């Protein structure tokens, strides 16, 4: 009888890639002509937050677009960003605090486990382990089908698949 195969579903942030994107976006904001004199900056605001500052709402949103483009070029999913609808205003400065989401929330973990149970009723088991899920099955083909299904699903979480056994 074949041993069970498994993998883990996690949602982790590659901090080095995000840091590279912040540095590239900061460099572009300082060099681009349309950002001259706007005081637009992008910087880390704690361990899991990035802050964009500018003197107008339009420039703050344009700086956010620059940051998003740098993240995409670095291969980081935009689903990790928690961006407010409008920038916070303090005096003449517009601040856009961006939180980076890491880990799978219990609600999303239950939702993913339910999707797996509905799609693959026999042979595939999903176990919630803190902020990650372990999916196991006797057939590796089923596990590959689960990965394909989750990649095509419209979840608001960036998923990575690790620890294939």
Swiss-Prot record:
NCBIfam families, alphabetized: PRK05412.1
Keywords: Nucleotide-binding
Protein name: Nucleotide-binding protein Tfu_2672
Similarity remark: Belongs to the YajQ family.
Annotated GO CC locations: cytosol
Job of this protein: Nucleotide-binding protein.
Classification via InterPro entries: DUF520, UPF0234-like_C, UPF0234_N, YajQ-like_sf
Alphabetized SUPFAM superfamilies for the sequence: YajQ-like
Xref: Pfam families: DUF520 (PF04461)
A GO term, aspect molecular function: nucleotide binding
């Amino acid at each position: 009888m074949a041993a069970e195969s498994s993998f883990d579903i996690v949602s982790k942030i590659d901090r080095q890639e995000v840091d590279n994107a912040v540095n590239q976006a900061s460099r572009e904001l300082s060099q681009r002509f349309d950002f001259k004199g706007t005081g637009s900056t992008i910087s880390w605001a704690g361990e899991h937050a990035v802050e964009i500052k500018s003197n107008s709402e339009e420039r703050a949103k344009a700086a956010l677009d620059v940051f998003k483009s740098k993240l995409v070029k670095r291969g980081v999913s935009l689903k990790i960003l928690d961006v407010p609808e409008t920038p916070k205003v303090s005096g003449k400065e517009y601040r856009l605090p961006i939180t980076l989401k890491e880990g799978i929330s219990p609600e999303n973990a239950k939702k993913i486990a339910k999707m797996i149970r509905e799609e693959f009723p026999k042979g595939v088991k999903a176990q919630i382990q803190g902020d990650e899920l372990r999916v196991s099955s006797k057939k590796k083909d089923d596990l590959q089908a689960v990965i394909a299904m989750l990649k095509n699903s419209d979840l608001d979480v960036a998923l990575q698949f690790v620890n294939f056994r």
